[in-house]
Every structure is written in C-alpha cells, then in structure tokens.
C-alpha cells in the first residue's frame, strides 16, 4: 500500500527540518574550527601533520627526553610556540611578560586539558573547579591556611619527622633511596593535617591506602606520556583503567569514612554552627576537615561529596609536591657542603644544640638562610614543572590573538633554568634570593614555583613550613651525602610532579654538634 501525497510531503518536510537542525550546529562548529586554524596559523611553531598534529615529534621519546625537546623548541621560537596535539592546540609561553598576563587574568582561570586525568580522584575540588564554584570554594578554604591554624600543625611536623629520623638510624653508612621515605613521611603528614588521622605510611608502606596512592601516581605518569592512554575511549578498555577504578574505590571510601566519623564526633560535641570562614583563624587544633565541616556556602553546609573533593585535593597537592621539594632540597645541600654547613649553623643558633628541642612555628620562621636554600631549590627543581590554562574565549596577549579552546602551557622549570632570566641558572646559589645583599633582581613572573595571580597555590606557606621542619630536624641529626656523580645533573621527568628518571641515592652520617 503506497503512501498518499500529503504523508510523503510531511515526511519530506520532517527530513528537511531535521537536516537544517543538524546543519546549524555543524556549521557553527565548522566556523569556529576555521577561525581557530586561521589564528593558530599566525602563531610560531613546528609544522604539524594531518590528524596527528605534532604527536609524531614525541613518538619514540622516553619521558625524560621530553623536557630536552621542549627546551629546544623554546630556544628556536624565542620562548613562544604552538603544538597541535590531535585536534587541540597548545601554546607554550616562556616569556615573563606573557606569563604575567596569563596568570594575572581573571578570564584565564580554567585548567588545561591534562588536569582532567585527575578528575576521577579529585572531581570538582579546588584544583579542577572553575567559575563561580572555584571562587566560592577558594573563599571558604583560604582561612584554613591562616597562621594560627598553621601554628597548630608544628607538633605534627615535629612528631612525624622524628619518626623518620629514628627510621633512618638503620640506614647509617648505607646508600638508600631517600625520596621514597620522604614520600611516605609527607603522606602521613598530609593525612593527619587534612583529616586528623594517620595512614601510618612510614611504618606500613604496604597498606591499601598507600598502594592506592601509588597506583594513581602510576596512572598519571602513563596517561601523560602514552598516547594510547590519553584518550578516554581507548584508556577505559585497558587493565590500567581497571586498576585506577579499584584504587579510587579505596581512596574515596577511606576519605568518606573519616568524613562521616568526624561529622558525628562534632555533632556529639555540640559543634553544629557553621561559619563562612571569618573566624577560623581564631581557632586552634583544627584539621582541614574540621574547617570544611563547619563551613557553608549560601547558608548551606557542604555536603560529604563537597568535602571529599577538597580533602582529596589537599591530599594530592600536599604530599607529592612537598615530597619532591624536600628530596631536591636534600640533593642540593648534599652537593654543596658549604650551604649545608651554613644551614646547620643557623639551626643551632635558632634551636640550640639540644636535638630534643621541638621545632615550632615561630622558630621555623627564623631560619632565614634555610628559606633562601629552599627558594633556590624550587627555582631549579619546581615541584610542579608545568602549569596549564584553558582559553575559553578568544583573547589577546601582548599582540598575539589566542583562539578559544587553546591550552596555554607555562613552565616554572624552564623559566628557572633560563640564562636570560638568571645568572648561572644551573648553579645552586641561595644568596640570589637575599633581597638585602643580592645584586640579582629576580622577575616575580619568572619565579613561580607556586604559580601566581588569583589561582596561585593556596598551600604554599604550609609547604614551606613542612620543608623547613623536616630539614631542620634531619640536619641537626645527620650529615647528608649524595651517592652518585655530582658532575652530572639528574635526568628529569616533567610530568604533573617533577621526578627523576632514577632515584636519588644518599648516605647519612651521625652529626656531632
């Protein structure tokens, strides 16, 4: 039975309407893509291939070879160059005047696409959130790093450091991987300051939680450098993705259990009033979780999921980054014995000769030369070697028109090693940061180990105090010696957290003060 003419016309009209509806967004997308390619063509950079973009330049490279390639491109294109990775453009910007604009802009606050690999763990925590949510969360979290709160953490720093010192008595005279132990130390510290509990990582490195954290670190490393793992469609079919899901289940359940327990404890204790954070600084002996549990947004307390996001973010940002900074600090002062000697002299002058004297917030703030050594370490070996921003709307940066959708890459690592910015950039010279005696005027937008602008690292004071605490306690107990070729710089891997290709090995000797 054939259709009559009117139904045929109706079907034809429907097909035409659907085609028009489908064509309009497609046409809009094609226009945007054309505009993106027109603007990108005006930016300097190596030639890219159809479909692959510049992926071919990275084929066959080991992770530790990538920084060398980026450094070559930065020199060739005078510090600014584009890379096309598949269908996405990235613009690397290594000029301080460009960095000042990017990091100082209130319109360039969203993170680059590489950070999405963390979303399974951190969800919409402070590191990954954007827009209004980021502004609100930043406001309520900032008081958690008030100096009165930081003061209350010095007992945790001191106790966990002494556990590490006791553990290291077994290593005296033997070569060992110091960074591995420091990683477990920072994990214990961040768990206790974030949630009020200890994972006992230093005494039980094989716990489910510690192994889950290691798994996530492996996932991040492989997704950064393996093209097969970068795309969700292919990644989700791999055994690594299954391992990640198991690890996330462990991490999330651990945090959620602590949140529920702590909320019940606060309710039993009669602490129910929420705060917008204004009076948090007047409180003491509060861990990060307590502050979140007593905070609100729009007169509503944070949900358990809200709190989990921020606690997990604090955990991620506070243990791996600090561990990297501590390890490279010990590496530098082991290579430069005179700097180690000056640090010890200052420690004795501030803390005295009694090694049982606890390190406190006030005493740590008086370790000025050590502060210079830490800053110089972070110039040479920034814990976060690459910062990324996402351009949501077309913008102009010092005459360069940047298309929407571009990822902007900024490297504290390459800035710190630039001969155009620092004299003898590969030499450890703490005095360059002495504002009184140094003739070297450092550009504030060329030294950004904690980023800069409105989205700078909220926990930088916490990190500096933790590094000082472990450095002060360890150095008054042990002399530190690097085991390896001091003439050769360590081979670096610039992923989300700066690492070395091979572990840095050290020997300890009992110090006599």
Swiss-Prot record:
EC number of the protein: 1.14.-.-
Chief localisation class: endoplasmic reticulum
UniProt cofactor(s): heme
Membrane association type: Peripheral membrane protein
SS bonds (residue pairs): none
Cellular component GO terms, alphabetical: endoplasmic reticulum membrane
Phosphoprotein listed as a keyword: no
Enzyme class: oxidoreductase
GO molecular function annotation: heme binding; iron ion binding; monooxygenase activity; oxidoreductase activity, acting on paired donors, with incorporation or reduction of molecular oxygen
Subcellular location: Endoplasmic reticulum membrane; Microsome membrane
Alphabetical keyword list: Endoplasmic reticulum, Heme, Iron, Membrane, Metal-binding, Microsome, Monooxygenase, Oxidoreductase
Superkingdom of origin organism: Eukaryota
InterPro entries: Cyt_P450, Cyt_P450_CS, Cyt_P450_E_grp-I, Cyt_P450_sf, Cytochrome_P450_Monoox
Segment forming the signal sequence: none
Signals that turn on the gene: By isoquinoline alkaloids and phenobarbital.
Chain residues that bind heme: 317, 457
Family as reported in the entry's similarity comment: Belongs to the cytochrome P450 family.
Role noted for this protein: May play an important role in the maintenance of specific insect-host plant relationships. May be involved in xenobiotic metabolism.
PANTHER family referenced in this protein's UniProt entry, alphabetically: CYTOCHROME P450 4D1-RELATED, CYTOCHROME P450 FAMILY 4
Protein name: Cytochrome P450 4d10
Species name: Drosophila mettleri
């Amino acid at each position: 039975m054939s259709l009559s003419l009117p139904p045929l016309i109706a079907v034809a009209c429907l097909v035409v309407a659907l085609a028009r509806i489908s064509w309009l967004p497609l046409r809009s997308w094609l226009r945007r893509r054309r505009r993106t390619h027109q603007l990108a063509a005006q930016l300097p950079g190596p030639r890219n291939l159809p479909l692959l973009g510049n992926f071919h330049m990275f084929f066959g490279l080991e992770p530790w070879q990538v920084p060398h390639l980026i450094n070559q491109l930065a020199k060739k294109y005078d510090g600014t160059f584009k890379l096309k990775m598949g269908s996405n453009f990235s613009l690397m910007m290594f000029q301080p005047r460009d960095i000042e604009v990017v990091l100082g802009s209130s319109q360039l606050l969203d993170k680059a696409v590489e950070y999405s690999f963390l979303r399974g763990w951190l969800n919409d925590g402070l590191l990954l959130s954007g827009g209004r949510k980021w502004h609100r969360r930043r406001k309520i979290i900032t008081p958690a790093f008030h100096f009165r709160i930081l003061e209350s953490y010095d007992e945790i720093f001191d106790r966990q450091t002494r556990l590490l010192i006791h553990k290291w008595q077994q290593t005296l005279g033997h070569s060992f991987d110091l960074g591995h132990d420091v990683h477990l130390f920072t994990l214990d510290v961040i768990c206790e300051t974030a949630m009020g509990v200890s994972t006992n990582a230093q005494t039980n490195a094989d716990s489910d939680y510690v192994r889950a954290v290691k798994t996530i670190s492996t996932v991040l490393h492989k997704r950064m450098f393996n093209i097969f793992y970068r795309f969700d469609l292919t990644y989700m079919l791999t055994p690594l993705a299954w391992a990640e899901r198991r690890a996330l289940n462990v991490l999330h359940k651990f945090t959620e259990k602590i949140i529920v327990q702590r909320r019940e404890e606060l309710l039993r204790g009669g602490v129910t009033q929420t705060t917008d954070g204004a009076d948090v600084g007047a409180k003491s002996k509060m861990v990060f979780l307590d502050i979140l549990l007593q905070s609100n947004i729009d007169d509503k307390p944070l949900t358990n999921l809200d709190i989990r996001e921020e606690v997990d973010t604090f955990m991620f940002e506070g243990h791996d980054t600090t561990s990297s900074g501590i390890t490279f600090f010990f590496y530098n002062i082991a290579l430069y014995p005179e700097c180690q000697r000056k640090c010890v002299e200052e420690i004795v002058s501030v803390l005295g000769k009694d090694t049982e004297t606890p390190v406190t917030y006030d005493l740590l703030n008086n370790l000025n030369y050590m502060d210079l050594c830490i800053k110089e370490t972070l110039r040479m070996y920034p814990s976060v070697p690459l910062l990324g921003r996402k351009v949501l709307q077309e913008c102009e940066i010092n005459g360069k028109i940047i298309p929407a959708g571009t990822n902007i890459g900024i490297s504290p690592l390459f800035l710190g090693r630039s001969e155009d910015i620092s004299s003898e950039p590969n030499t450890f010279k703490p005095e360059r940061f002495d504002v009184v005696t140094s003739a070297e005027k450092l550009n504030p937008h060329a030294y950004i180990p904690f980023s800069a602008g409105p989205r700078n690292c909220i926990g930088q004071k916490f990190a500096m105090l933790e590094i000082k605490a472990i450095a002060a306690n360890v150095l008054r107990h042990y002399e530190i010696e690097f085991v390896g070729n001091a003439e050769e710089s360590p081979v670096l891997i610039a992923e989300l957290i700066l690492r070395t290709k091979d572990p840095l090995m050290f020997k300890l000797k009992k110090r006599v003060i």
